Amino acid sequence: QYNNAGPYLLGVLIQRKTEKNLIEYLTPRLFDKLEIKPLEAEFCPKGYVFGAGGLQMNVRELGKFGQLYLQRGKWKGEQILSEKWIEESTKKQVECGDYNNSQVDGYGYLFWHLKGDAYMANGKYGQYCIVLSDQNSVISVNSPETEQSDRVGRYIMKKLKEGRRNNGKE
């Protein structure tokens, strides 16, 4: 079942092993290559990056991240993430838990698996990066939500469902 402990512990392990926090570790390997900077993140009281969230990106940067996944880990001719990682991280690994959305059918490694050939990463205040592989599309959204809510996500999912129904893909 989904929870935030796994991604948090991954960040802790990376920092202990490399002596660099998660952002410092990922910057030359991922963020610099995608031209995403400067990055801000939330830290826990013990000094570790909160690996399950708190990463701040604008909508264009979020879209680049989604495009990297849509392109199976390849960016400007370089394989930044392995295709195997893309495949494993975006497929259903565990049940959704209490995430109540009719378009979500499971959780992968940091991604929600959606019905059809689609998946998304989302933030607690209305940030979404949705990859629609079957439509060769990425949708990135930064909304001004001030409360932890999935109102924006529900609206997006409703419109995607309507679009798929109209295109005969549901």
Where are the predicted features?
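Active-site-proximal alpha-helical segments within enzyme catalytic domains
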Residues: L9-L13, G53-K74, Q127-P144
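A beta-strand-loop signature enriched in Asp, Gly, Thr, and Trp
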Residues: A41-F50, R72-G97
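Short, gly/Ser/Thr-rich active-site loops of penicillin-recognizing serine hydrolases
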Residues: S149-E170
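Bacterial peptidoglycan biogenesis and beta-lactam-recognition machinery
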Residues: Q15-E24, F31-L39, N58-L81
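Active-site Gly/Thr loop motif
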Residues: P38-E40, I86-I139, T146
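Carbohydrate-binding/catalytic loop surfaces
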Residues: C44-M57, D105-Y107, W112-K115
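Catalytic-site signature segments of enzymes, centered on catalytic residues
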Residues: Q1-G53
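Non-transmembrane alpha-helical segments in soluble domains
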Residues: G11-I14, I23, T27, F31, ...
